[in-house]
């Protein structure tokens, strides 16, 4: 599988050199990175008295514009791999993040390829929201001279599987674009589909665009300034869990943990706004229960990625057990001829509801059957890492990384169930135990470059995590810009996450304003969006003063409710209608003044 960084075995740098290089460049802007690149090229190719001249090709080569619209990094990895394939075929390619793409130039594109994921309820990734809105607006141009292809990544456990890719594909065709290839919709196990699609794209584009001389093949755009690290999703760092502290009260309905992980001397670097990827082990007790329900022993040999493993080991480390999907329910029903599940087959809504409310182990318990080991793993999806917003800044914690974990716990007919990664960190990794981690960089959730810029942070629940990192960074830098936090949770006494730290920031003058919404401390429920409306006039003043707005947390409900409140505030105090307010907020998004990290 292709990773965000080249395989270290193919690089002229060893892991330590790569780590030092990353540490030296982690805070540089794309423009600064480009300058450094040119500087080293000049060092390598000194020409006394020569003036650098950009060679002009004999004829302009048709270029391929490749747009990466990524939420968790997978779409970016596919786009980067396709970029490399196109360069190897000597084709001109411009790879760009959707958030950096000047979408009004889309009418001039001849060859356009989009690799996109989907988030929430079928919404485009955060970095692609502006492009999506533009294409679906009255301003979208005709695209009769544009040929396009779309690769869509999704997760069949969600109702609106690959909806963003479906949207882009249908809209580009509706605007007159020529579809080069049928859209591909890939589930979480996307690698094989992506590899096949990439090969087809290269073949098609080679027939559409003349092959350039190697010196003419170029790759430009923000995505090319990637973060290089010897540790990746497929080659994670084996780190140490040093602190596991419950930060909700004993009477809280929530179990939230502050987790600290020691990165040692790995040199692994991150920035506020990045996420920590965590590979986890399924609960051995859950594996034992599932195996016994199917009348298996756990020692049956199965093949995983070409290796033979005992079934129990394969289930613990290689397969998703805590998230059910409509496809799994349908396939299990068909395979076992279950009388209770077969009536659901063909009814998408019922399948989705059943999968969302019934874990895999309970599906088997309620509809027992006998399967052999290979049939069982054939039903399951591969284990994927969980991403957690980083709650620390290395300017303060150095070789540590902190995350805020809401532990998923619930009962199914009296049987305790838990989330895979959250219970792994909270219950099964002892302090000083090993955990495999990597950094998922998120350049679409960054503090302002100007330290004097005001910042508005909206993060209920565990959405508070990146704002702890933001404040640590701003404090370490002595940033003079004002800071305003909106936080909410059920109860003040039980659920005020990092309360002492926020109070200290207020006392020190670093946190200029804090508005708190406790939804269960009074008869009428109060949420952060209510506080936004309550502070509308002051909020509008901050926006007019150039403030950047950040939202982190639940994508399904909170993010939409917060955006609705922001639109109402902009409309009321900006003296405009909702449509104009929506345009205003879209402009803030394009200017990177409205950024969201929602999940």
Swiss-Prot record:
Complexes and interactors: Alpha(8)-beta(8). The alpha component is a flavoprotein, the beta component is a hemoprotein.
GO molecular-function term, one example from the UniProt record: sulfite reductase (NADPH) activity
Annotated FMN binding sites: 70-75, 117-120, 153-162
Transmembrane segments: none
InterPro entries assigned to the protein according to its UniProt record, in alphabetical order: CysJ (IPR010199), CysJ-like_FAD-binding (IPR003097), CysJ_Proteobact (IPR029758), FAD-bd_FR_type (IPR017927), Flavdoxin-like (IPR001094), Flavodoxin/NO_synth (IPR008254), Flavoprot_Pyr_Nucl_cyt_Rdtase (IPR001709), Flavoprotein-like_sf (IPR029039)
Cofactor binding note of this UniProt entry: Binds 1 FAD per subunit. Binds 1 FMN per subunit.
One Gene Ontology cellular component: cytosol
UniProt binding sites for NADP(+): 519-520, 525-529, 561
Domain FAD-binding FR-type positions: 234-448
Residue pairs linked by disulfide bridges in the UniProt entry: none
EC number annotated for this UniProt entry: 1.8.1.2
Domain Flavodoxin-like: 64-202
UniProt family annotation: Belongs to the NADPH-dependent sulphite reductase flavoprotein subunit CysJ family.
Catalytic activity: hydrogen sulfide + 3 NADP(+) + 3 H2O = sulfite + 3 NADPH + 4 H(+)
Cofactor: FAD; FMN
Broad EC category: oxidoreductase
Protein name, UniProt field: Sulfite reductase [NADPH] flavoprotein alpha-component
Pfam families in the record: FAD_binding_1 (PF00667), Flavodoxin_1 (PF00258), NAD_binding_1 (PF00175)
Gene Ontology biological process terms from the UniProt entry: cysteine biosynthetic process; hydrogen sulfide biosynthetic process; sulfate assimilation
Record bears the keyword Metal-binding: no
Function: Component of the sulfite reductase complex that catalyzes the 6-electron reduction of sulfite to sulfide. This is one of several activities required for the biosynthesis of L-cysteine from sulfate. The flavoprotein component catalyzes the electron flow from NADPH -> FAD -> FMN to the hemoprotein component.
Tagged with keyword Flavoprotein: yes
